[in-house]
């Protein structure tokens, strides 16, 4: 490695923003994190303040450098990974957002999406984008934002308006407003990217009423996007990789060939399988998406993936803490779940933001079923953890059907993986081993690996991946049969929770 001995990863997630420093061996040196406030202006609506995201990003960058006692000149590159689909509009002359960012979990555009479906657009949108027509993705959110900001400010000069997902917003700010760009992995989550061409789709921009001038330039995921303005850290540091968070985790796990897959347990759970250089079309309502892109001899090389997106997993645990006040912190859920022999007949449907794959039911809502006078707090907590494992099984079953050859092992990452009860239950219900790495921040690790490889700090991707340490492999145990029987009961509960909201 050169005299610059660190790579910084910026991991801008749904619940918080983090800066992590990695050394030349790909190991974490230090990190700084700040939880991000969530705004719920109406039921089913979720917003973030983009200025808070940027302020916390700056704070995390400066704090991690101070904590690690390093000179910013030693940072060779920055890799950026973000929550996907969350988007905003801002004024490029003032740098001010025109509205709070609409978060991926937000359902305010469900009726608008249903309208488009009734007009017969569903199949065409899937054919062009690989995505289902759902309020989850950015297209309908940007359409809503544009209508709303024009309503609030009829004299708005649209020539000054630009749009982006969180990577684009962060990049624009990091470069002092010089670069308005995104990468293919984030662009593929907007409902506006033509998946086979890798460019913005004019027909879909027209359909959603979004001017092309709003949209960022699309660049390969690995490569120099720009340099940080010297007013941050006093250095021009290349921003050398951008990934959506799930694609970054896929990259960290070394899933770069057909059939290699991982599951990340964050705010939601996301199971992603690489499909090589071909777009795989699911028969089970999984998404086709870009894994990542890179340039080889001047040509853009695209890797694709299929994905099962489950909207609510870690968010359920957060809700137990903040909404129901059943727990003081996430860590205690493990002990509570283990304190009872079973779930006491209680089942939870984690449809707090509707249901994602494989149901795609925007009207589903969360539910506890099977409650009797004997149900205790421990049973409720256990039911929530079991539900996280059950929904992953649904998606693994769908991937198995699509791929034709059953998955032999599940690689996992994300904060909820710290929960040993959840990981063991996941192995039991799947009937296959679950491999947990020592570094659970695979999203940040993937962004760091990508940036370091892009600027030549590292040359050997396979070697980097091979050096990752495994913490534990959970194997199916004595409770596997019971867990699999409970899964069938849980599927009945899911049917009861579907088609609930208008």
From Swiss-Prot:
Gene3D superfamilies: 3.30.420.40. It catalyses: glycerol + ATP = sn-glycerol 3-phosphate + ADP + H(+). Sn-glycerol 3-phosphate binds at residues 14, 84-85, 136, 245. GO terms for molecular function: ATP binding; glycerol kinase activity. GO terms for biological process: glycerol catabolic process; glycerol metabolic process; glycerol-3-phosphate metabolic process. Its EC number is 2.7.1.30. It is an enzyme of class 2 (transferase). Belongs to the FGGY kinase family. Key enzyme in the regulation of glycerol uptake and metabolism. Catalyzes the phosphorylation of glycerol to yield sn-glycerol 3-phosphate. This is Glycerol kinase. It comes from Acaryochloris marina (strain MBIC 11017).
């Amino acid at each position: 490695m050169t005299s610059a001995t660190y790579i910084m990863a910026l991991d801008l997630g749904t619940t918080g923003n983090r800066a992590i420093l990695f050394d030349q061996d790909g190991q974490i040196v230090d990190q700084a994190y700040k939880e991000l406030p969530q705004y719920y202006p109406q039921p089913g609506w979720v917003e973030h303040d983009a200025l808070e995201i940027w302020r916390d990003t700056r704070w995390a960058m400066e704090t991690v450098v101070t904590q690690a006692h390093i000179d910013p000149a030693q940072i060779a590159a920055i890799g950026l990974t973000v929550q996907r689909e969350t988007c905003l509009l801002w004024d490029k002359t003032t740098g001010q957002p025109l509205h709070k960012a609409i978060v991926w979990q937000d359902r305010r555009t469900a009726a608008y999406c249903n309208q488009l479906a009734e007009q017969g657009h569903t199949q065409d949108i899937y054919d062009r984008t690989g995505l289902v027509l759902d309020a989850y993705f950015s297209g309908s959110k940007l359409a809503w934002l544009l209508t709303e900001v024009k309503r609030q400010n009829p004299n708005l000069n649209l020539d000054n308006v630009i749009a982006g997902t969180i990577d684009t917003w962060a990049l624009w700010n990091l470069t002092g407003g010089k670069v308005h760009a995104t990468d293919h992995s984030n662009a593929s989550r907007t409902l506006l990217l033509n998946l086979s061409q890798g460019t913005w789709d004019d027909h879909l921009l027209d359909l959603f009423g979004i001017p092309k001038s709003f949209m960022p330039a699309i660049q390969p995921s690995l490569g120099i996007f720009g340099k940080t303005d010297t007013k941050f850290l006093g250095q021009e540091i290349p921003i050398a990789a951008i990934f959506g968070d799930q694609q970054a985790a896929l990259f960290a796990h070394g899933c770069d060939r057909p059939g290699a897959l991982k599951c990340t347990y964050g705010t939601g759970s996301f199971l992603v399988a690489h499909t090589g250089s071909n777009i795989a079309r699911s028969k089970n309502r999984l998404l086709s998406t870009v894994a990542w892109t890179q340039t080889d001899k001047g040509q853009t090389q695209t890797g694709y993936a299929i994905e099962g997106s489950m909207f609510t997993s870690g968010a359920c645990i957060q809700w137990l803490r903040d909404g129901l006040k059943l727990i003081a912190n996430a860590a205690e859920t493990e002990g509570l779940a283990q304190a009872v022999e079973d779930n006491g007949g209680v089942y939870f449907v984690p449809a707090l933001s509707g249901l994602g794959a494989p149901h795609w039911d925007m009207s589903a809502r969360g539910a506890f079923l099977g409650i009797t006078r004997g149900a205790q707090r421990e049973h409720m907590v256990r039911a929530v953890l079991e539900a996280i494992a059950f929904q992953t099984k649904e998606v693994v079953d769908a991937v198995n059907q699509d791929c034709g050859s059953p998955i032999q092992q599940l690689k996992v990452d994300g904060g909820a993986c710290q929960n040993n009860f959840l990981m063991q239950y996941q192995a039991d219900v799947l009937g296959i081993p679950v491999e947990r790495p020592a570094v659970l921040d695979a999203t940040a690790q993937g962004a760091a690996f990508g940036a370091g490889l892009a600027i030549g700090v590292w040359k050997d991707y396979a070697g980097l991946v091979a050096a990752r340490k495994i913490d534990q492999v959970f194997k199916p145990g004595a409770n596997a049969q019971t867990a699999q029987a409970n899964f069938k009961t849980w599927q009945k509960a899911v049917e009861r929770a579907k088609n609930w909201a208008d």
